[in-house]
C-alpha cells in the first residue's frame, strides 16, 4: 500500500519487485488474469506518492558479450536482466486505487517510468508519469499484455533517453 511514500534512488530502480508469484500463462491473450499474480500495488485514497528513479542496469548473458576493440564497452550482447524503470517489477504488476480512487502516484524517471517484465494491469488511482523514454513499458517479447481498466493516466515523455513511447508493450 502506497500511503504518502516519497522514494528516490539514483543507483537502482526506486521501487523494485523481484520475487513475486506469476500467473500460469506464457501466451498473450485478451483475457490474461493477473488479479492474483505479480506485485499488487494499492494507492491509498487521499495520498500523494512520489517515486523518482534514474538508473539503468544491464546484466548480459556472458556467452553473448562482444566488446569494442579497446575492451571498454559492450558493442553487442543479449540481455539477461535490465532494470531501467523507476517503478519496476520483474514479473506482472497490478495497480489499484482504493474505494474513492483519489490516491496519486507521481513517477519521475530518467528512463522508463512504470515498467513490468510481464503483464501490467491498471485498475485505479491517479498516475502521473514523466519519463525520458517510455512512460509505461511491458517488455517480455511476445507475451506481455498492458491493460487499463480504470483510473486516470497522464504520461509526459521527453525522449531524452530513447524513442519515448507513452505506452510500449513489446
Please report, for each region that a protein language model flagged, where it lies by residue.
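A composition-driven surface/loop motif
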Residues: 1-170
Amino acid at each position: 500500500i502506497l500511503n504518502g511514500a516519497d522514494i528516490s534512488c539514483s543507483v537502482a530502480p526506486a521501487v523494485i519487485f523481484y520475487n513475486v508469484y506469476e500467473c500460469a500463462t506464457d501466451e498473450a491473450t485478451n483475457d490474461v488474469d493477473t488479479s492474483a499474480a505479480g506485485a499488487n500495488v494499492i494507492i491509498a485514497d487521499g495520498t500523494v506518492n512520489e517515486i523518482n528513479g534514474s538508473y539503468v542496469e544491464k546484466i548480459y548473458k556472458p556467452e553473448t558479450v562482444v566488446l569494442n576493440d579497446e575492451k571498454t564497452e559492450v558493442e553487442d550482447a543479449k540481455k539477461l536482466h535490465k532494470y531501467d524503470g523507476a517503478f519496476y517489477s520483474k514479473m506482472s504488476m497490478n495497480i489499484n486505487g482504493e474505494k474513492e480512487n483519489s490516491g496519486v502516484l507521481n513517477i519521475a524517471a530518467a528512463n522508463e517510468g512504470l515498467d513490468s517484465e510481464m503483464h501490467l494491469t491498471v485498475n485505479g488511482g491517479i498516475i502521473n508519469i514523466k519519463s525520458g523514454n517510455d512512460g509505461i513499458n511491458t517488455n517480455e517479447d511476445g507475451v506481455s499484455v498492458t491493460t487499463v481498466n480504470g483510473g486516470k493516466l497522464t504520461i509526459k515523455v521527453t525522449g531524452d533517453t530513447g524513442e519515448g513511447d507513452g505506452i510500449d508493450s513489446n
